[in-house]
Amino acid sequence: MTQVPGDFDEYLHLFAPHGGTDISYSRHHYQRYIQTKQRILSNWDRARGNKLLDIGAHWLHQAILYAIDGFKVTGIDLPVTFELDNVRALAQAHDIQLLPNSDLERATALKEIPDNTFDIVLFTEIIEHITFNPVAMWRQIYRIMKPGARLIVTTPNYYALRGRMWNLKRFLARFGGGLEVLDILSRHTYAHHWKEYSLRELIYYFCVLSPDFDCVDRAYVEEYEPGYLGKRGGKIVHWIERCVPLLRPDLYLVVELKSKERGIVVEPHW
């Protein structure tokens, strides 16, 4: 039986004895954590293993949900996050291993992990923030995944009806595409979505990385809860998103490492 907090208040009680956490941030993402976990475990046989790596674990908001459910959890994130007393106390209480890592491009913290360690790797709301060539990172992740392990990817949908692609006003003003100039100049690097993907493009991404990867499940995901996107939709927009999956705001992809024969086959070049 999957363990899930009864509601958000019960979820917050997990953090309270250890110094609490950011309530506003956790409230905003709570339904994403819950729904993603339900999707994963609805198609995962626990007999396959329970070692889970959360890449970009932040304040352990997602990691804790798996730790209380019997998973052996490891989290990787920036040292400044894992130095927080409340994060360290929560990790100790729930036997979550913390791997501080200041350079995800090379994923140096993962080098201490033995080959074929993890059964599930969470890569949720991370891929859109990457600003570097990720091949070296994926080599490390591939190495520590067991044959048969699954990589879980969630990310915004490039074709989302409420996404930046459909900004007609910006198009008519000839202000280009992608990130806006003021966002690039005024916000820190990892605050941005530097690259958003379509579902087909995301599947192609992993097919190119390695023929050992097999995309075994995929979904266009509706808004996790009203207000999650920070952009009003209205009844008509929500109706369109329900009827046309391509226009839904989020993507969910399960990539299985079916075997370890070819490895990561991409070699970056100038």
Ranges and model annotations:
Residues W59-G70:
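Conserved SAM-binding loop of SAM-dependent methyltransferases across substrates and taxa
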Residues Q3-Y33, L78, A89-D95, P100-A109, ...:
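S-adenosyl-L-methionine-dependent methyltransferase catalytic module, highlighting the catalytic core
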Residues A109-V121:
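A short acidic, Gly/Pro-enriched loop at the edge of an enzyme's catalytic core
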Residues I120-F132:
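A short SAM/SAH-binding and catalytic strip from SAM-dependent methyltransferases
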Residues K72-D77:
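Conserved SAM-binding motif I beta-strand of class I
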